[in-house]
Amino acid sequence: MLFACAGALAQQSQGAPPEQRESFDPSRDAAKDIQAALRQAEASGRRVILDVGGEWCIWCRRLDSLFASHPEIEEYRRAHFVTVKVNWSPENKNEQVLSHYPKVAGYPHLFVLESDGTLLKSQDTGELEKGKGHDPEKVMAFLKKWAPSK
């Protein structure tokens, strides 16, 4: 029964568009997710954020919590970016995909891409922290700095 439920969840997760997924999933094809996100970004005049991390990562969960508890920041992010969660964990380090980007020193790590795939920014999220979480003002400033001009 447990395996049947896990299989159903995996199928459901595989079909969800990249920006609608809320968790890091080692079974995802990150390369396909990024390509889909680039197409969405191109069609909608947005940029792409690659959010690299894993479910094991407390700071990844804290960053997710910031977006969940600050709807104005989440709305701004969704209006200007297509966000793709790229899993990094023992089950799937996504080495092939991540080899195209600068080395990641810690998690979560954010890459901002233009809709054509050009890397614009490699962001260590430690710089966005304050105390035991991420600073809403710093995160919003980061998003505003890298949002496309409309």
Residue ranges and their predicted role:
Residues 1-12:
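Sec-dependent N-terminal signal peptides of Gram-negative exported proteins
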Residues 10-28:
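N-proximal helix/coil linker or "cap" segments that precede and/or mark the start of modular domains
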Residues 26-46:
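A short beta-strand-turn-helix
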Residues 28, 68-93:
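Thiol-based oxidoreductase modules, predominantly thioredoxin-like and allied folds used
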Residues 44-55:
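Short active-site neighborhood of thiol/selenol oxidoreductases, capturing the structured segment around
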Residues 54-68:
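Conserved redox-active cysteine motifs that mediate thiol-disulfide chemistry
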Residues 92-105:
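Structural alpha/beta surface segment adjacent to cysteine/selenocysteine redox centers
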Residues 105-150:
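Non-catalytic, surface beta->alpha helical segment in thiol-disulfide oxidoreductase systems
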